[in-house]
């Protein structure tokens, strides 16, 4: 309960709200106000804020107890918020200008090192998918594994997508915070399990970003890796666990990089889910007092799922017009299954290069086939479970809004 009380409204949260207001205003007024207009408008609040600051310092030297100081600080803060509003408008109009610019096709030789790395990673990912195909697994089993582990949802058919959507588990088909978190924890475990070790955290974060590059920089993975990087900074600073203030910092960084992130459904759902977990999870978790680690783990999983649903449910209803009635139950299958699938995929990734060692090749191939059989069994199980769930009476409430249909 004490943890709940510490979630105060901070300047970073105010910054993020005002920045968001500036971005939205600039997007819908772009036809009338360009970047030059917003730069010109921003001069006034900057000037007033600077004048208020200098007057405050001057009065403090001569009369520190003057009441005028409070008013000047108030005006200074007000104009700083206007400056932040203009900053959001400026970066938004600049981003729109960039999007409207003619597309230039570059030759491979003129690409930057980073762009070449992305292309090489794409080739490497295609080779990994082809290697999975050679292991002779079902089409939709492969599709689910490729979606979860490599961010490639192109092989998923409509029936599978619909089954996962109705059962409330479609989030595990996109590489997002859940997947990045699982991989991050696995890497820390493989490196010795020291969560506060600087070397472990730096290496784990670097490997996570290498993984994001490997799967082709999908927006959800980049978003999750950015939030994870900020979480890593919190761990390295030896401060308490992340709060809403940390989330606000992640939000500001990602919005400054790309202001149009705020209009992305996945972006909105990610931040609402994490914010809701930070707010409600401690409140729910403390309702059950048990000394059993197993019961606490199950209860913790339920509390995380419930807290995330509270935050994302309004968006799901608004955008999709659907409520998945069994999502809290299916999460007990989806999250452990996703964890096992990712762990086994990492094991396959580690074993794969060893097949080129002649005296180990036959043993490694047999072990890989065993891992693949387990992986396929898990995938078949969750595919069947979620299809059956989607067929249950009252599995979802549809067409809540007429416009959603």
Task: Identify the residue ranges that each predicted region occupies.
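Aromatic-rich juxtamembrane segments at the membrane interface
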Residues: 2-8, 17, 105-227, 232-233
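Internal transmembrane alpha-helical bundles of multi-pass membrane proteins
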Residues: 5, 11-20, 28-36, 75, ...
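Glycine- and aromatic-enriched alpha-helical transmembrane segments of multi-pass membrane proteins
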Residues: 13, 37-105, 288-289, 295, ...
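Cleavable Sec-type N-terminal signal peptides
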Residues: 41-44, 48-51, 55-58, 80-84, ...
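Ser/Thr-centered flexible coil motifs
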Residues: 34, 73, 112, 138, ...
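Helix-to-loop transition at the C-terminal end of transmembrane segments
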Residues: 95-103, 133-136, 349-363
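C-terminal ends of transmembrane helices
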Residues: 56-58, 189, 233-237
């Amino acid at each position: 309960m004490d943890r709940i009380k510490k979630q105060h409204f901070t300047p970073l949260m105010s910054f993020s709200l005002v920045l968001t207001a500036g971005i939205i205003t600039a997007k819908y007024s772009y036809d009338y106000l360009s970047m030059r207009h917003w730069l010109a408008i921003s001069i006034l609040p900057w000037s007033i804020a600077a004048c208020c600051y200098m007057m405050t310092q001057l009065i403090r030297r001569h009369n520190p107890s003057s009441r005028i100081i409070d008013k000047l600080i108030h005006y200074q803060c007000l104009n700083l918020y206007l400056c932040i509003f203009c900053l959001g408008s400026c970066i938004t109009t600049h981003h729109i200008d960039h999007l409207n610019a003619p597309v230039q096709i570059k030759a491979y030789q003129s690409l930057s090192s980073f762009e070449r790395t992305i292309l090489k990673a794409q080739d490497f990912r295609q080779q990994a998918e082809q290697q999975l195909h050679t292991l002779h697994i079902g089409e939709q089993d492969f599709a689910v594994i490729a979606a979860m582990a490599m961010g490639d949802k192109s092989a998923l058919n409509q029936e599978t997508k619909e089954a996962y959507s109705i059962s409330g588990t479609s989030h595990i088909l996109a590489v997002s915070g859940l997947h990045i978190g699982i991989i991050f924890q696995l890497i820390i475990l493989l490196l010795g399990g020291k969560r506060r070790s600087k070397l472990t955290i730096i290496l784990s974060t670097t490997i996570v970003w290498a993984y994001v590059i490997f799967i082709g920089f999908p927006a959800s993975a980049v978003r999750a890796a950015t939030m994870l990087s900020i979480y890593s900074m919190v761990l390295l600073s030896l401060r308490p666990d992340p709060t809403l203030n940390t989330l606000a910092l992640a939000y500001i960084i990602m919005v400054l990089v790309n202001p149009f992130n705020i209009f992305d459904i996945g972006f909105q759902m990610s931040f609402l889910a994490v914010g809701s977990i930070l707010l409600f999870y401690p409140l729910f978790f403390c309702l059950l007092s048990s000394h059993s680690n197993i019961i606490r783990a199950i209860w913790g999983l339920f509390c995380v799922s419930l807290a995330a649903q509270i935050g994302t449910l309004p968006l799901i209803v608004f955008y999709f017009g659907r409520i998945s009635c069994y999502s809290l139950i299916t999460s007990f299958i989806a999250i452990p299954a996703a964890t096992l699938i990712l762990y086994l995929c990492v094991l396959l990734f580690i074993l794969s290069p060893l097949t080129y060692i002649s005296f180990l090749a036959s043993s490694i191939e047999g072990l890989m086939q065993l891992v693949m059989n387990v992986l396929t069994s898990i995938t078949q199980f969750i595919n069947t479970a979620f299809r059956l769930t989607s067929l249950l009476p009252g599995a979802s409430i549809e067409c809540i809004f007429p416009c959603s249909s």
